UniProtKB/Swiss-Prot annotation:
Cofactor: FAD
Membrane topology, as annotated: Multi-pass membrane protein
Purpose: Squalene epoxidase; part of the third module of ergosterol biosynthesis pathway that includes the late steps of the pathway. Erg1 catalyzes the epoxidation of squalene into 2,3-epoxysqualene. The third module or late pathway involves the ergosterol synthesis itself through consecutive reactions that mainly occur in the endoplasmic reticulum (ER) membrane. Firstly, the squalene synthase ERG9 catalyzes the condensation of 2 farnesyl pyrophosphate moieties to form squalene, which is the precursor of all steroids.
This protein's name: Squalene epoxidase ERG1
Gene: ERG1
MF terms in GO: flavin adenine dinucleotide binding; squalene monooxygenase activity
Entry keyword set: Endoplasmic reticulum, FAD, Flavoprotein, Membrane, Microsome, Oxidoreductase, Transmembrane, Transmembrane helix
């Protein structure tokens, strides 16, 4: 057993673990971070970061994690709906500075670590003089290794490679978590801390510590593949392909490599037998690929190097209860959404920012003060909902809208794209929500139902006078469908 008692133990060194560990360490806390495998991971998600995620990295003083990994700028979205296309830029900085300004974590920023450097692929002047906010795309593993190195460079951080097998509770008070038990080559080692934070990701072993029913649902899968030297219709944009097929995403992760993620609608993964994945991509996705990108897609298709990952949803539970003192969930172990909108890292990083601010020593002098931490966690749960509810509800609603093929959904899809084509606030609002720079749930509510009513209006126009009775019936179908695919998720995110 380790004789050292830490202020905080962080379980997991994915994207979120190193950020909260670094923030605590810079605030003077003694932190232990435990990771099962410190080698570079190879994942097909966590490669596209929205502008609100970039903002969070600045607030944490960890923006340089996107440097020197051949990251590429992301300046907005290119949407292809059947044979129609529209390009949507990210919000203007002058607007973003009002709706979601940069507010550094106290003691985490030194005036240098919140500044991006120029490197072989990123130009600081391009970022600084662009009138709009930017996101970035990169290889997940390279980005993660930079985050980990920044974390390990902190004098107050101790990094250990081990598997956490058990959450330790106080024998005299089982409601209080006092540390973790780990399995190492030398045997079992226990570590103790005043506060334990689990950031062990989508397959979290410890989220059930809060409740045995705290489990995610799987509604679909992503099939991922890499394209080499692909030509895309809009450089520097995330590409979303919509139409008579499940949605697909295309975005560059380096100057020469492009990621494609294709939704497979099923609660079970696609079969690896009989070339089922190959045939699915060839028959359903290939016809929708932009013509410039087809050669590279065909080449990747023939290589048959497919990666499959579940798309999971889990709303965040309230934390700080009397029977879980000294224990916090953070990141994907707490909360997940459909990755269609690329908002996972954005939500997690902003949670790190918020928690580091709320637990700063000027508010919580000692992590042993469980009663005070419980109060701060209630504030955390309430304040995180603005961004969390927007990103999570938007992701699952867009997936539900574009992944199924019922008549009301087809009417809504058509109305949604036509709504974007109107321009102005019909596109500025939605991209502000998607980017995380407009974290306002009621704005999402307004735009979603504006789309619904506009869809009904367009359908009346298309049906004409003779088709009025049918259009009237379809109007009720469309509005009912809109309520069903949107309201329960928004309610769950806001109220739970």
């Amino acid at each position: 057993m380790s004789s050292v008692k830490y202020d905080a133990i962080i379980i997991g060194a994915g994207v979120i673990g190193p950020t909260i560990a670094t923030a605590f360490a810079r605030q003077g806390r003694k932190v232990l971070i435990v990771e099962r495998d410190w080698s570079k991971p190879d994942r097909i998600v966590g490669e596209l970061m929205q502008p609100a995620g970039i903002k969070a990295l600045r607030e944490l003083g960890m923006i340089k994690a996107i440097n020197n990994i051949r990251a590429v700028d992301c300046t907005g979205y290119y949407i292809k709906y059947y044979d129609e296309t529209i390009t949507i830029p990210y919000p203007l900085k002058k607007d973003a500075c009002i709706t979601n300004p940069v507010k550094p974590v106290p003691d985490a920023v030194d005036g240098v670590n919140d500044k991006l450097d120029s490197d072989s692929t990123l130009n600081v002047d391009d970022w600084d003089f662009d009138e709009r906010v930017r996101g970035a795309a990169f290889h997940h593993g390279d980005f993660l290794m930079n985050l980990r190195q920044i974390c390990r460079d902190e004098p107050n951080v101790t990094a250990v490679e081990a598997t956490v097998t058990k959450i330790l509770r106080d024998p005299s008070d089982p409601n209080t978590v006092i540390g973790v038990q780990t399995k190492q080559p030398s045997g079992t080692v226990d570590y103790h801390a005043k506060l334990t934070i689990s950031c062990d990701g989508i397959y979290s072993k410890f989220r059930k510590e809060l409740s045995p029913t705290n489990v995610p649902t799987i509604g679909s899968y992503f099939i991922g593949l890499y394209l080499k030297n692909a030509e895309l219709p809009a450089k520097g944009k995330g590409h979303v392909l919509l139409g008579g097929h499940a949605p697909a995403l295309i975005y560059s992760v380096s100057p020469t490599e492009t990621r494609v993620l294709c939704v497979y609608v099923s609660s079970k993964p696609p079969s690896a037998a009989n070339d089922a994945v190959y045939k699915y991509l060839r028959d359903n996705i290939l016809p929708a690929i932009p013509k410039e990108t087809v050669p590279a897609f065909k080449e990747a298709l023939e290589e048959r190097k497919f990666r499959i990952m579940p798309n999971q949803y889990l709303s965040a539970m309230k934390q700080g209860s009397e029977n879980h003192k000294g224990f916090i969930l953070l990141g994907d172990s707490l909360n997940m959404r459909h990755p269609l909108t690329g908002g996972g890292m954005t939500v997690g990083l902003n949670d790190s920012v918020l928690l580091a601010k709320l637990l700063h020593p000027k508010f919580v002098e000692d992590f042993d003060d469980h009663q005070l931490i419980a109060k701060r966690l209630k504030t955390f749960h309430r304040k995180r909902k603005n961004l969390d509810a927007v990103i999570n509800t938007l992701s699952i609603s867009l997936y539900s809208l574009f992944a199924a093929d019922k008549k009301p959904l087809r009417i809504l899809r058509n109305g949604c794209f036509k709504y974007f084509q109107r321009g102005g606030e019909c596109v500025n609002g939605p991209i502000g929500l998607l980017s995380g720079m407009l974290p306002f749930p009621m704005l999402l509510f307004n735009h979603f139902f504006s789309v619904a009513f506009y869809s009904v209006y367009l359908n009346f126009i298309e049906r004409g006078l003779l088709g009025f009775p049918l259009a009237l019936f379809e109007a009720f179908e469309v509005l009912f469908t809109a309520i069903v695919i949107f309201t329960p998720y928004l309610w769950n995110e806001i109220v739970r």
